[in-house]
Amino acid sequence: MDDTVKNTTDPVFLHDTFLAWCDKQPVPVIEGFGMDLSKIKAEPWDLYGMNGAICLLKGRDDFNSIFCFELPPGSKSRDIHHLYEEIVYVIDGYGSTQIETPDGDKHSFEWGRNSLFSVPLNAKYQHFNGSGTEPARLATVHNFPFLINMFRNEDFIFNTDRDFSERLGPNGYFQGEGQMIEIRPGRHQ
């Protein structure tokens, strides 16, 4: 009798789950050393409820990437939540974002061109275009590639209800209590 344990699944070596996920998305995937995010063609993306494109910078490794989103005039995104960290930069337009914290409180804030913000990890949020005549364009830098390659489970990343309330900070963060940091000439990081 053979007591050898047989592997019933194929090994997953040199497989990039993120790139395979990108291939299944109905939006353009653009790769290059640089790209003008204000001119990229964005197509409808039901997952987010807005138009979008996936932007892959050469040399990015498997840690992060960019999604470019466009909200048509007067539109809004779907309610979204996910386990990846994301920083949002507003390329053009103005609008608002509503965040629902784990305790059910809703906070909203406005944004405009050159705004930069981040939504708390796995909090539900929705973007709104504040213009009835002009689109709003957002670029997000995120660590989704790292997480999807680690867990290999899209459902886990987009449908986990775990709250991270310890990462929310004080309520003042949602009420405009902040400190304006003036731009200083020179190179700073």
Q: What residues fall within each predicted segment?
A:
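Conserved short histidine dyad/triad with adjacent acidic residue
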Residues: 50-52, 65-83, 101
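His/acidic/aromatic-lined binding-pocket segments of jelly-roll/cupin-type domains
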Residues: 68-69, 79-81, 85-90, 108-109, ...
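A short hydrophobic beta-strand segment most commonly corresponding to one strand
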Residues: 87-89, 117-118, 133-152
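Histidine-centered metal-chelating micro-motifs
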Residues: 75-78, 96, 115-117, 121-127
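A short, N-terminal "cap"/entry segment at the start of jelly-roll beta-barrel domains
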Residues: 1-63, 156-189
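Short histidine-centered beta-strand/loop micro-motifs
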Residues: 55-58, 77-82, 99, 108-110, ...
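Short acidic-glycine-tyrosine-enriched beta hairpin
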Residues: 60, 101-122
